[in-house]
Curated annotation (Swiss-Prot):
Keywords: Coiled coil
Coiled coil: 213-243
Composition-biased stretches (Polar residues): 244-256
Identification of the protein by name: Uncharacterized protein R502
Top-level division of the source organism's lineage: Viruses
Family matches, as InterPro entries: GIY-YIG_endonuc_sf
Organism (species): Acanthamoeba polyphaga mimivirus
Region named Disordered: 231-256
Length: 256
């Protein structure tokens, strides 16, 4: 998959509606969004800041689409912050989901509006949605809570078994300190390769090889060479530390 394309990118009416509402966003606003599956007719409702800043990076637009992208990336990178929703994402294609802006509001009222929309659309009902939480709280309905806890436990168990089997299959023939790695790039493409990591004398050495221009064989070979380089570098540092401090060169004075 070269790029994440959602249903609202394909459907003209959905696209026009999203673009029109996104014009209301600014640096002081956030959005309450709905992610709607066109086949199951179930939704997930969440909130997002219109603009975000990470570390030293410049401020960038996030909004509903940016937040959905993060959910998609997270669920395929082994995270499970929203267990029921992430399980649904993992078992689907992005084209099955429409990202809809429900409300643009000030950041101050973002949480309040998220809770209102979850209650209004009843997406904490397992028959209608994927929201385990109503805002930051668990659903009040005991029946919903039991259903979600059961689904969450099943999701976590299946994910644990699946993840363990995948990791074992990918890494069983690899050298120690080299692991298979897969990630979704910023443009939505999937990158895969190898990750070298080793800790020697308290120092952690690591490097990833995920370039799309290299074959998997070339990436593995590069990873092996880098691992040896890390070991040599660590050995060199150790040798310098253990060199006798009193070993000075004696200079002849010419006297007898």
């Amino acid at each position: 998959m070269a790029k994440i394309i959602t249903f609202d990118d394909i459907d003209i009416e959905f696209k026009k509606l999203y673009e029109e509402l996104s014009k209301q966003e600014s640096y002081t606003t956030g959005v309450v969004y709905e992610v709607f599956n066109i086949f199951t007719l179930k939704s997930y409702i969440g909130k997002a800041h219109s603009y975000v800043k990470n570390g030293n990076q410049p401020v960038r637009r996030q909004g509903a689409k940016g937040r959905f992208y993060k959910h998609w990336k997270s669920c395929h990178n082994g995270e499970n912050d929203c267990p029921i929703f992430y399980e649904a994402l993992r078992n689907s294609d992005p084209q099955e989901w429409a990202v809809i802006i429900l409300k643009v509001c000030s950041l101050k009222h973002l949480k309040e509006w998220e809770t209102k929309m979850i209650e209004r659309l009843d997406t904490s009902n397992p028959d209608k949605g994927y929201n385990y939480f109503v805002g930051d709280n668990k659903p009040n309905n005991p029946e919903y809570l039991v259903k979600y806890q059961s689904a969450k436990a099943t999701s976590n168990a299946e994910r644990a078994v699946s993840g363990a089997l995948k990791k074992k299959a990918h890494n069983k023939d690899l050298p120690a300190n080299i692991n298979y790695r897969k990630k979704i790039n910023k443009n939505g493409s999937i990158g895969e390769g190898y990750f070298v990591q080793i800790k020697i004398d308290g120092h952690l050495y690591n490097k990833a090889f995920l370039s799309g221009t290299m074959s998997m064989e070339a990436k593995l070979e590069a990873a092996k060479k880098t691992l040896e380089k890390f070991k040599q570098e660590a050995a060199s540092k150790r040798a310098k530390r253990t060199k006798p401090s009193g070993s000075k060169t004696t200079r002849s004075t010419g006297r007898k």
